[in-house]
Amino acid sequence: MTLIAFELSGETPEIPTAEIVGVLESENIPFSFKCQLEQVFIIETPGIDAGLTDILASRLAMTRHIIEVSGVSPANLTDIISMAEKVDFSNLNSLTYIVRAKKIKRKSHISSEDIERGIGKVLYDRGYRADLVNPCIQYRAIVSDNTCIFGPVIASIDSSAFERRKPHNKPFFYPGVLMPKLAQALVNIARVKEGSVVLDPYCGTGGIMVEAGLIGASTLGCDVQRKVLIGAKINLDFYSVNYSLMFQDAGSMALRNNCVDCIVTDPPYGRSALIQARSLDTLMQDSLCEMYRVLRPKGRLVLVSERPVETWAQNAGFRMADLFTQRVHRSLTRRITVLDK
Ligand SMILES: C[S@@+](CC[C@H](N)C(=O)[O-])C[C@H]1O[C@@H](n2cnc3c(N)ncnc32)[C@H](O)[C@@H]1O
């Protein structure tokens, strides 16, 4: 059994762990939950090969590093060094290394430099060679909740691609779009995988479809604004994803029953959005029934809203799987409702 630690980005507490679980489940990677520290999520697994590590690294939006845990100790220098002394570094062979320490929210009193120097000395004394510029292996010591988690980094997540896909950088921009990092995390929570059929019934400029399409899903989007749909086509073509767009109302979709694997959507909040001849409440109730109808059994819907939708969703037939809230600004807290059919 191998312990794997995910060093999480700090933006929200629960969404990063939910997306990890979503990816592990969608990729059929066997695992059991080990523990959760602040910004660190640890699982136990029979083993992750390089291919699966690459999949995790390419899909996770809110993880920074993935670490194979070699040692765990209380977060004081003496215990950290004696933990490092017990670690088997023999797989380093003649490879060079660097040791990096990260204190979560700077809570601990020990300095990162002392941890790096202390563990580095253990390796140096055993004859291993450090390379501070271009090391073959990075060891990471993460100090969180009075615990130090130590081991080699098996993957680091490059978030620059998410930056490049920010709404303003896309060929077509229209206000009210989710950031690609969050869109990708929601796609992961929905357990989308390569080959899945993913629907966004309120697709707007196609932000969610782009993220699902980039992991190899076939995407389907509906909207009732022609100019926005034309913009979605421009964006989806730009990223060369597999898509179909429909000019149709989310409250009555020309789709057959059980035909999509996952739904991820960000319906209008009812402020400036176009809703088409009825109240937002009626639209939400109608479209939740439609989403339930077109989703395959055991399929998952991840829905972003400002107001609670649980009762309508349960009336439509859905089972609540999770609920996350995310404060956007003083007058807007997003609700992310995860619903299973
Ligand atoms: C919050 S935006 C979605 C933004 C989208 N995630 C994106 O990447 O651009 C909500 C979208 O719902 C659309 N909409 C409003 N009423 C609708 C309806 N009855 N059926 C389908 N789409 C509708 C709006 O035109 C708008 O594009």
Language model feature labels by segment:
Residues 1-62, 77-86, 104-115, 125, ...:
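Class I S-adenosyl-L-methionine-dependent methyltransferase catalytic core
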Residues 93-104, 108-131:
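Long recognition/docking surfaces used for binding and targeting
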Residues 87-92:
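N-terminal, Lys/Arg- and Ser/Thr-rich interaction peptides
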